[in-house]
Structures are given as C-alpha cells and as structure tokens.
C-alpha cells in the first residue's frame, strides 16, 4: 500500500469516527436551564438573542470572495515565467471578469447599500 492510499484511508476513517462521535455526544434533549442565556448569574435584562443583520453577513461574504480573489491572483507575476503564459493570463482575466460581473450584479441589486 503506498503512502497516498494510507493517508487517504486514515483521513476518511478519522473523519467518519469524529463525525460519529460528534453526532452521539451532544445531549438529545437540552433542558431550559441550558438554553437560557447566562449573564453573570443575574436574570437577563433584555433579550440576549439579538437579530443578526443580514446586510452585514452579505458584505462579509463579499469581502471573503474578493479576499480569495486577491489570494488567487498573488502568484500571477510568476505566471509569465511558465511555458504558456498566455493561458495563465487568460484564466486570470476570466476570474477577474467573473468576479467583476458578480460585483456589478450585487451593486445593481442593492446588496452593497448599508442603509435602506
């Protein structure tokens, strides 16, 4: 058995064992005491479960997408040293065009507007 097959087998086995353990370990029926918020032993003054802003979530997702884009384009200056630099530049241009179209779509749909 070669090294890659051994590593893949160990990874799959470990993942299955951890998924099974995480499925069976939590309590099946938590009581009201565990579901209540804890504020230093005092009764909560207000609702501890505040609604999460969906706008903030969308902007955070957009930030992650463009951060990933920058990470993908960082090795681009070394791409011109390959045998076929035209293909590398073509793919990077396609990625930039796709993300630019996505940004334009989000902008036209109002996804970047913080206040309505």
Curated annotation (Swiss-Prot):
Location(s) in or outside the cell: Mitochondrion membrane
InterPro entries: NADH_UbQ/plastoQ_OxRdtase_su3, NDAH_ubi_oxred_su3_sf
MF GO annotations: NADH dehydrogenase (ubiquinone) activity
Keywords carried by this UniProt record: Electron transport, Membrane, Mitochondrion, NAD, Respiratory chain, Translocase, Transmembrane, Transmembrane helix, Transport, Ubiquinone
Record-level GO cellular component terms: mitochondrial membrane; NADH dehydrogenase complex
Lineage: superkingdom: Eukaryota
Membrane topology qualifier: Multi-pass membrane protein
Catalytic activity: a ubiquinone + NADH + 5 H(+)(in) = a ubiquinol + NAD(+) + 4 H(+)(out)
Pfam families: Oxidored_q4
Family: Belongs to the complex I subunit 3 family.
PANTHER family: NADH-UBIQUINONE OXIDOREDUCTASE CHAIN 3
Name used for this protein in its record: NADH-ubiquinone oxidoreductase chain 3
Taxonomic lineage from the root: Eukaryota, Metazoa, Chordata, Craniata, Vertebrata
């Amino acid at each position: 058995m070669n090294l890659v097959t051994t590593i893949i087998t160990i990874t799959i086995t470990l993942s299955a064992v951890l998924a099974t353990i995480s499925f069976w370990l939590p309590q099946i029926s938590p009581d009201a005491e565990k579901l209540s918020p804890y504020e230093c032993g005092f009764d909560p003054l207000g609702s501890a479960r505040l609604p999460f802003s969906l706008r903030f979530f969308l902007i955070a997702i957009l930030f992650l997408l463009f951060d990933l884009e920058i990470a993908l384009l960082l090795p681009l200056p070394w791409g011109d040293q390959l045998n076929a630099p035209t293909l590398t530049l073509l793919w990077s241009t396609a990625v930039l065009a796709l993300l630019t179209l996505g940004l334009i779509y989000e902008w036209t749909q109002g996804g970047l507007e913080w206040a309505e």
